[in-house]
From Swiss-Prot:
Part of the ribosomal stalk of the 50S ribosomal subunit. Interacts with L10 and the large rRNA to form the base of the stalk. L10 forms an elongated spine to which L12 dimers bind in a sequential fashion forming a multimeric L10(L12)X complex. Belongs to the universal ribosomal protein uL11 family. InterPro entries: Ribosomal_uL11, Ribosomal_uL11_C, Ribosomal_uL11_C_sf, Ribosomal_uL11_N, Ribosomal_uL11_N_sf. It comes from Methanosarcina barkeri (strain Fusaro / DSM 804). This is Large ribosomal subunit protein uL11. The lineage of its organism: Archaea, Methanobacteriati, Methanobacteriota, Stenosarchaea group, Methanomicrobia.
Length: 161
């Protein structure tokens, strides 16, 4: 029987404690070795929470799948902030450029249901709203409308999805 352990771990800094250790212990695998592999695969996401899936088969073979961090974490890393606004309607904690939004959208390509870059960018902008982050100096919802109206089409020209 194959067992699957899913967890959100700090990029490059997973440890044998919770949530991994208690979940992997009963499966009889070398926890230290698994944690080292996870840290190796997630080191590029240092400072962010990263979803990982550890798949252990009957013969104790381990496969590790690493997802991309949540969109909010990517936005915070891009802006260099620790957290979003506690009062999103009236407090702005940062401003993100349309090229940064596109960069995050490309990172999330494998994890979203959108069919193109423009739709994924709208999802990223939607995450900016409750965080108190503006896009190109205006509220994220207004930037979504501008994207729909073609204001940023020059940035998207020739983009393969």
């Amino acid at each position: 029987m194959t067992s699957i352990v899913e967890a959100l771990v700090p990029g490059g800094k997973a440890n044998p404690g919770p949530p991994l250790g208690p979940a992997l212990g009963p499966l009889g695998v070398n926890i230290k070795e698994v944690v080292e592999k996870i840290n190796e695969k997630t080191r590029d996401y240092n400072g962010m929470q990263v979803p990982v899936k550890v798949i252990v088969d009957d013969k104790k073979n381990v496969e590790i799948e690493v997802g991309t961090p949540p969109t909010a974490s990517l936005i915070m890393k891009e802006l260099g902030i620790q957290k979003g606004s506690g009062n999103a309607g009236s407090e702005v904690v940062g401003n993100i450029s349309i090229s940064q939004v596109a960069k995050i959208a490309r990172m999330k390509k494998e994890d979203v249901l959108s069919y193109d870059l423009k739709a994924t960018m709208k999802e990223v902008m939607g995450t900016c709203v409750p965080m108190g982050v503006t896009v190109e100096g205006v509220e994220a919802r207004d930037s979504q409308k501008a994207l729909d109206q073609g204001k940023f089409d020059d940035l998207l020209a020739g983009e393969e999805w």
